[in-house]
Amino acid sequence: MSNAPAKAKARPRKLVEKFAWRGIEMSATHTRDWLGEGWSHLEMRVLKPKGRPVPITDTGYLSHFLDENDVKAAGGPAAFFMAWLDREAESKAYRKALARWQQLDLFA
């Protein structure tokens, strides 16, 4: 029996990127090998302005798991989210939510 201490499992390292999409400040957190080798966990948060609607989340936070190769192919976590946001920004639901938010802003 060895007296050497047991090796603690290394925690996945997080990388945070800040980016802007259509005037909205956001962050993208990328954790590699989250579920196992080759699987990434991405998190997106709306930083400013708080409460502004974005097309892929109603809460300002999004958690997404995907293959690491998909993150690389997109050009990184911020590029992955910006492409997703651009695709979904054309939806009727998003345009309606944005119009409602802008109308409320007039009365602030």
Task: Annotate each language-model stretch with its function.
Residues 3-12, 65, 69:
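Generic preference for well-ordered secondary structure
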Residues 47-108:
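Acidic, low-complexity intrinsically disordered segments
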Residues 11-43:
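Amphipathic, interaction-prone secondary-structure segments
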Residues 1-6, 104-108:
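Short intrinsically disordered terminal tails
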